[in-house]
Every structure is written in structure tokens, then in C-alpha cells.
């Protein structure tokens, strides 16, 4: 019974250490991204206008308005590109 308890506690300790190490690695990788927050905000602002602009162009050409698909993990919703 003692051996089982020791084995369970050891596994729990290893799991906690592994999880902590994985979180630290993920945080360090996120901080190494080269694009500053201001550039990301500019990209997001551009994406918000992508769908309605393409839709208006199609309306002016007397065609049925079909939303252009957004690319790169974005989709059209409510005439805006939103992150999927």
C-alpha cells in the first residue's frame, strides 16, 4: 500500500513539473514573435473592411453580392472578416 501511494505521489509530482515546464516553454515562444502589437492591430483593422468592400464592388457591377472568402484563419460574418 505504501509503494502504491509513493508511486501515485511521484506521478503527480512529475505531471505538475511537466505541465509547468510546458507552460513556460509556450510563454517563451509567444514572446519571441517578431510582429509588435501595433502591427497586429493594423492587420486586424484591415481585415474588418475586407468583406464589405468586396461585397460593395460586386453590387456596383450589378451582380449578386457574394462575400469573398477571407483567408488566413478569417471568415466573413456580418459583412466583416472575423477570426475563426
Curated annotation (Swiss-Prot):
Expressed by the venom gland. GO terms for molecular function: toxin activity. It holds the Pfam family Toxin_20. Disulfide bonds join 51-65, 55-76, 70-81. Residues 23-47 form a propeptide. The keyword Signal applies. One of its GO terms (cellular component) is host cell postsynaptic membrane. Residues 1-22 form the signal peptide. It is found in: Secreted. The keyword Glycoprotein does not apply. It comes from the Eukaryota. Keywords: Disulfide bond, Neurotoxin, Postsynaptic neurotoxin, Secreted, Signal, Toxin. Belongs to the neurotoxin 12 (Hwtx-2) family. 02 (Hwtx-2) subfamily. Postsynaptic neurotoxin. This is U4-theraphotoxin-Hhn1n. It comes from Cyriopagopus hainanus.
